[in-house]
Amino acid sequence: SCLPYNLNINVAHAAHAAGIHYFDLTEDVPTTKAILELSETSKGLMAPQCGLAPGFIGIVGSHLTNDFTKLRAINLRVGALPQNPTGLLGYAFNWSPAGVVNEYLNDCEVIKDGKIMAVPAMEDNETIFISGLHLEAFTTSGGLGTMCETYEGKVDELNYKTMRYPGHCELMRFFFQELHMKNDRKAAGEILVNAKPPVNDDVVYVHAAVE
């Protein structure tokens, strides 16, 4: 299923009833947990979170841990961005605006001091350079998939952040917090995708570090 996260549960139930395999790209944590519960009685394989993040970045991070006998930190970063950013946001909604709003507003699951905990989205900003390109990174929800459950007690720190062109996070905080758009997620998504529609020339940046 490549549908927005809020439509995936119905598709998953249909796959479960038909006894066929199910895959999706969702980043939504409650949706994922519901599908994993379905998988316990499914005849087919049910695998949510098979996209870029969660999905690919988790595979990269997990692979890197194979070179270590003891883990201190797993730091994962992903940015899907327009190659030629315009305006102050420097962004284009090349995938579900509902999903972007979701990951900007929901709490983020991380491991800190060896234990799973929740932290706010759009926080803990950092500067990062990818091949000389200046980007910012900040916490967003859902990017780790089920990695926290996998690595709890095995690593001191595990976190995921989204990368954007500098200044994006501050503007998004203003949009959601100061303008109270967090209270109307549907309208927020419509406004954002209308302002920053999809583009053909996009690029994905990935950064994974394991200590």
PLM regions and their residue ranges:
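Adenosine-phosphate binding glycine-rich loop
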Residues: 42-82
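Rossmann-fold NAD(P)-binding glycine/threonine-rich loop
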Residues: 9-17, 21, 25-48
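Rossmann-like NAD(P)-binding element
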Residues: 1-8
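Glycine/Thr-rich phosphate-binding loops of Rossmann-like dinucleotide-binding domains
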Residues: 8-9, 84
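Conserved beta-strand edge residues that scaffold enzyme active sites
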Residues: 29-30, 53, 124
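C-terminal catalytic/substrate-binding lobe primarily of soluble NAD(P)-dependent oxidoreductases
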Residues: 67-211
